[in-house]
């Protein structure tokens, strides 16, 4: 039976917990990031605990001694729960909660909670609920026990700010319904994409680590008016806007959801239809926060996620953002990209270079056209203006002299006996 439980807002005080099996500095950096995630989700981190172990304990995540230590810290700090920096198995969740007698959450629950509060579009809400149900279906017993302790907080947000408790059969049925709805959305996206291709409008996807400044960049370039907050996952639903380049060429720019380390696989699966905007784009703009001391790690995470999505064959521009806040001696280099620019989306520095680079790349993907059109063929010049880059238009006695760059698929219909060649 489906049971709806109304939630009340609470202030959660949580202890962040991680297991380091190698580089402790990396574990500290990951916990710092988890602290930002927890803050974004509306809770406060009152302590951070790292246990150095050869491997994560398969039954309880932590060792017995560390569990006792954390139990004391929970009492001392009046904490309402703990958040583990890795995704817990159903057994780990259940056993750890039993040992600590408190609410236990993991990194995935926090990320899903943020996504649930940020989803605006129908597609975004479907994708978040699908990811939540896939995660919860294997953890029903542990989650019911844990979430019922406080009646709300991290891990309980969802459609309508209510917690939906289901048995496995109902969850399975609901997942099937959501997948069908997502297929409908995907088909609609495909129709829109085909129309875009028919109109010969190139597209660029803006990707990057969360909080790298993707939305700020899109706002700067297109005056899109997107909420650009200094928060993790400020953008969840993709936004597409048109950018007119100096030579008249149009390009569609799409802001996508940010990537993050330890991004749950079922989240990537759920958001595949959204991330396909990157897969079917002509250019990838990889925005990098070059003021972040963990810049190299963040770049690695983005490339690994793109590889998992099968997006490795696109023209890549690495956009080193926030140069106004970066250390003077920082080395900015990305051997995996085709082009690199340094900008500040906040101040506007370097944006002209980025725009010119986009124009150059698109021009090099076109065919050069030079010919004289009769005055009866003026409609073809309108096509060039709309889909290409008109370099020169000169009215002569015998017709209109034109040279331009045009999409290769339009060249045959525009050229006739024209003098043309690939640049």
Swiss-Prot record:
Matching PROSITE patterns: G_HFLX
UniProt keyword Phosphoprotein present: no
Locations listed in the record: Cytoplasm
Pfam family, one: GTP-bdg_N
Annotated keywords: Cytoplasm, GTP-binding, Magnesium, Metal-binding, Nucleotide-binding
Binding positions (Mg(2+)): 215, 235
GO cellular component: cytoplasm
Annotated Hflx-type G domain residues: 202-366
GO molecular function ontology, one term from the record: metal ion binding
Gene3D superfamilies: 6.10.250.2860, GTPase HflX, N-terminal domain (3.40.50.11060), P-loop containing nucleotide triphosphate hydrolases (3.40.50.300)
Cofactor: Mg(2+)
Binding-site positions, GTP: 208-215, 233-237, 255-258, 321-324, 344-346
Keyword hit for Acetylation: no
Highest taxon listed in the record's lineage: Bacteria
UniProt cross-references to PANTHER family, sorted A to Z: GTP-BINDING PROTEIN 6-RELATED, GTP-BINDING PROTEIN HFLX
Similarity-based family: Belongs to the TRAFAC class OBG-HflX-like GTPase superfamily. HflX GTPase family.
Subunit structure and binding partners: Monomer. Associates with the 50S ribosomal subunit.
Reported function: GTPase that associates with the 50S ribosomal subunit and may have a role during protein synthesis or ribosome biogenesis.
Name of the protein in question: GTPase HflX
Organism: Lacrimispora saccharolytica (strain ATCC 35040 / DSM 2544 / NRCC 2533 / WM1) (Clostridium saccharolyticum)
Gene: hflX
